[in-house]
UniProtKB/Swiss-Prot annotation:
Name listed for the protein in its UniProt record: Putative uncharacterized protein YGR270C-A
Cellular component, GO annotation: membrane
TM annotation in the entry: 46-66
Mode of membrane association: Single-pass membrane protein
Natural source organism: Saccharomyces cerevisiae (strain ATCC 204508 / S288c) (Baker's yeast)
Length: 72
């Protein structure tokens, strides 16, 4: 399991280590997304649910595409 966080401005932070994630989540006002490599990707659905700060069961490629499109 990997973690991705998104702040109010839509910028993304990728957290690959659970320990680091546990540390930063306490003082950053971010919404958290959990994702898995097992699920299929659908970019339209990913971008849609990203606005709700929750992307269920998306693969890594899909997440990184969303991140690239979201960061100015």
């Amino acid at each position: 399991m990997m973690f991705i966080t998104s702040n109010i401005n839509g910028r993304l932070i990728f957290v690959h280590d659970l320990v680091i994630f546990q540390k930063i989540k306490h003082f950053l006002n971010f919404c958290v997304v959990y994702f898995s490599q097992r699920a299929s990707c659908c970019m339209d659905y990913a971008i849609f649910v990203f606005n709700l700060c929750f992307i269920p069961n998306l693969c890594v490629a899909c997440i990184f595409n969303v991140a690239t499109a979201s960061i100015p």
